[in-house]
């Protein structure tokens, strides 16, 4: 059974704060990066490379500092003006792609999309187009999860992020069989 009507997507920016910092520092692409909270107390964003090294999310900076120094992890104080500006650009891109009325901003780096108007299209291709366009227009990489409900779209987004290479950062759960697995 295919779910063709009432499809939802969530577009989630990948390691958003780190991605924003890298956008203006391209020499950090493929290098470990972390962003710290206000007053540099905790780690609030980690690049995939920092995750692989074992840098913990929300961990106190002073505890992670030896690991960060050992591996030369690029470390940034949070820059909320930059993140807000790039968030706005990502959300505006989504509004252009699916219509303003079909975008529900969920957080600074996430938005739900109503894909009812796209029900007859290939949702995998639509997700790939959304991902590619956001990256092309803003420089920010995103993952896209598509499913009949918001909760399932969050699950599909998690699956997309879990294996970025195989999924191309897009997973569509549009059948009972896909949802069951």
Placement of each model-derived feature along the sequence:
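Gly/Gly-Pro- and Ser/Thr-rich, intrinsically disordered tail segments characteristic of DNA damage-repair
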Residues: 2-181
């Amino acid at each position: 059974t295919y779910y063709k009507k009432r499809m939802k997507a969530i577009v989630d920016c990948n390691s958003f704060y780190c991605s924003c910092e890298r956008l203006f520092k391209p020499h950090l692409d493929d290098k470990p990066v972390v962003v710290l909270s206000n007053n540099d107390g905790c780690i609030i964003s980690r690049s995939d490379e920092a995750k692989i090294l074992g840098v913990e999310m929300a961990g106190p900076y002073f505890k992670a500092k030896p690991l960060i120094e050992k591996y030369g992890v690029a470390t940034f104080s949070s820059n909320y003006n930059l993140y807000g500006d790039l968030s706005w650009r990502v959300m505006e891109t989504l509004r252009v792609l699916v219509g303003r009325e079909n975008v529900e901003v969920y957080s600074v780096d996430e938005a739900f999309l109503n894909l009812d108007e796209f029900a007859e299209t290939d949702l995998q291709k639509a997700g790939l187009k959304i991902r590619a366009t956001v990256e092309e227009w803003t420089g920010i990489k995103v993952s896209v999860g598509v499913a009949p409900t918001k909760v399932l779209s969050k699950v599909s987004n998690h699956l997309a992020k879990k294996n970025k290479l195989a999924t191309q950062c897009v997973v569509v759960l549009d059948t009972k069989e896909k949802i069951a697995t």
